[in-house]
Amino acid sequence: MIVTMNNLLLIILPALIAFLCACWIHPYVLKVAKVKNIVDKPNARKLQHVPIPILGGLTVVFGILSGIMSFQLFGEYADFFPVFASVFIILIIGLLDDMISLSPKVRFIIEIVLVLYLILTTGFQINDFHGLWGIDIISKYVSLPLTIFACVGIINAINLIDGVDGYSSGYTMVSCILFGIMFYNLGNIQMVALAAIVAASLAPFFLHNVFGKTSKMFIGDSGTLSLGVIFSVFVISIISADSTSMSAKENLGIIPFTLAVLCVPVFDTLRVMTVRIVRGKSPFSPDKTHLHHLFIELGYSHIGTALSIIGMNLFVVLCWYCAYLMGLSIDAQLYIVILIGIFITFVFYPTMKVQIRKETLLYHCFCKIGASTHVTRKGFWLFAQKWADKSVIEE
C-alpha cells in the first residue's frame, strides 16, 4: 500500500481524537465508579489489597467509539457501524457483568449471538485457509461454525488476561501495532486506522493503570470483552483477506501470524481450562492458575509480570517471522507457533511450579530477576504518577 498524506491523516486524526477523548473521560468515569462504589473488592483469588474502581473499560471504549465516529466522518468509504454496534452492545453486557456478575452460560450465549450478528452484517468469515494444509476456499458449512468457535474463543482468551496492572492494556496495545502492520501490508487502510484507534484509546488507561495511584482503575469485563470483539474482527479480517492482496507475498502464513499474536492468551486459556476440566471443575471457575499468577508467585512486580509475558508473546511472533523469512511452508510456520505456544504454557507453567516446590537454583534465579522488577516511586515513576493523578476529580 502506498503511503499518501490522505492515508496518514485517515490513520492519525481518528487515533488522536480517540486518545484525547479517552484522556478527557477518564476522571469523570473514575468519579462515578467511586461514588457508586463500582469497585473490584479484594478476596482470596485477587491480587490487589484494596478496592479498585472497575470502569476502566468504559474509558477505553469511549475513546474507541469516538475514534470510529471520527473515521466515519473522514473516511467516505468506511463502514464501521457493525463494529461500532457490536462493541457498544458488549460494553453494556460487560458493565452488567462487572456490577452483578452474569453467569458464564448467559455470557456465552450473548457472545455467540453477537458473533452471528457480525458475520451477517459484515460478511467476515474464515472462508479461506490460504494454502494451509493445501486448503484454500472452504465450505460455508465449515466456515460458519469455525468462525463462531474462533471468535468466541478469542473473546474469552482476551477476557481472561485482566489479572495484573498493565498486562491486558499493554498486551492489546502491542497486538494492535502488530495487526496494524499486517493490515498495512495487505493494503487495508480501514483496519490500519481501527488498530491505531484502539491502541490510542488504550494508552491513557495504561498510564493510569500502571503509574496512577488515586487515578488507577481496572479495565473490567466491559473493557476486555469489548477488546475481544475487536480482536475477533481483526483476526477474521486478516484471514478473509482477498487472495489477490497476498499474491506478491509467497508463503505468508496469515493464520500462523494471527495465532502467534494471540499465542499466550489462547494457549494459557486452553491450559487453564483443560486443568480445570481434568480436576472436575467448571472451565469457567475462577482460580489463580494463570501464567501471570505464576510470575507474581515468583516475586515479579505487576509491571514486571506484564512486560515478561508480553515479551514472551513477542518472541513467538519473532519466531514466526523468522520462519517466514526462511521461506518455510505455511504448515511449518503454524507448527512452530503451536510448539512454542505449548512450551511456554503447558510445559513452562508446571515445570516452574515444580521448581518453586523444590526451591531449586532455577527458582532462585527467577526470584532474583523478579525482585529486580520492583521499583520505588521516585524519579520518572513519581513524575508519571503525579501526571496520572493530577486529573482526579475530588468527590
Task: Map each language-model feature to its residues.
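Membrane-embedded alpha-helical core segments of multi-pass
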Residues: F88-I93, I110-Q125, L146-N156, T172-L178, ...
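Juxtamembrane helix-capping/reentrant segments at transmembrane boundaries
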Residues: K41-P53, K216
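Alpha-helical transmembrane segments
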Residues: I2-V32, N37, V61-I89, S168-W381, ...
